[in-house]
């Protein structure tokens, strides 16, 4: 049965406290992300029971509504109900600064910046894999123009990642996007890259008598992110000191002259060191624990997705693949985690007597197993029924251990699933093909069996029908409150 996205959007907005309680909305691959003015106006119990809503995640003033793979359709309906000139709400007061709030702010900035970039990163990754397969199979020869262009297409999103990060972060930090892109562009300019290559070879490089640290910024996330955050403060300060008559030309010139050298001399190197330190910590643990670290990550992955913490690993994965050509801890652990959620959803679809739950579970299983998108299975089935989540965690640990022992590593960062399994193929290790499909099969079968053994409390058909009637009774009152520009 097709979802009524218009009714879904009306119900979600009503449960969030109406149009007047929403200051901004965006979406990632599976979630609608609302910025809320007053959390007290949110009707969480109603929001969670709206058919089509797989789950709800709260974070400070943001409410994330999990829809699944069709989130873009729901997003279009939500946007149609909101004012076209919507502006973010002004903060009522300055919140108290605590370590928890600082940590939450950093995580929110990272997730808010990286989430819109994931489609471009995955698209580039898959094109690079296609080029690798065509070369391995002999369809294209090494050095051929077609292969070179394919590699350039696949590499574009990674090489110019600082520009993409700057653009996305500018939206997040509410600063001028063109200035952010211009300053990030300095870091990947061919002349600057050449200068940094000379510095790396020992040649003294300075700017205004200040030594410049030899750093490579292509394929990086943290430097551009920190730089754009600093730019948001620099822009406000420069705006406050420049006369109104000179703002058109003096303000942008001063901003660039302040922010660009600051990025080159201080912010950029610090950002690289932070990123390198995080990567070193993660892979030092992997070096000590070996396959056990992959197993632990496989069990924890669904819990990390629940909190949004899984996005923390995105910069680390990108940097590791850029430096070594593959990643062997986080990505292999996702094979078992994603397909285990798919297998447990299949078991629920097999066992349930609720037609609506069966339909939800089958769709969620297909999404997790085929495409590696596990959130519909996680929120729509596993968390909802609890015991399938336990089965998935156990299966994820065991499959992670097998993937770690087999030495599987990914050459891309697409969500691991059947369609993206090619990213784990290693030309130097033909058995990697066998191992990746073996781990996938084990994940589906093991989680399926464990879910049947543990059982689950089925949702009565009467309850589902009552929820559907409640959903259909929602009137489009929200639409009357909005100016449809």
UniProtKB/Swiss-Prot annotation:
Q: What are the BP-aspect GO terms?
A: phosphoenolpyruvate-dependent sugar phosphotransferase system; trehalose transport
Instruction: Indicate the segments forming the PTS EIIB type-1 domain, all copies.
Output: 1-88
GO terms for CC?
Answer: plasma membrane
The chain positions of domain PTS EIIC type-1 read 108-470
The subcellular location is: Cell inner membrane
EC number(s) on record? 2.7.1.-
Q: Where is the active site?
A: 28
Q: What is this protein called?
A: PTS system arbutin-, cellobiose-, and salicin-specific EIIBC component
The species is Escherichia coli (strain K12)
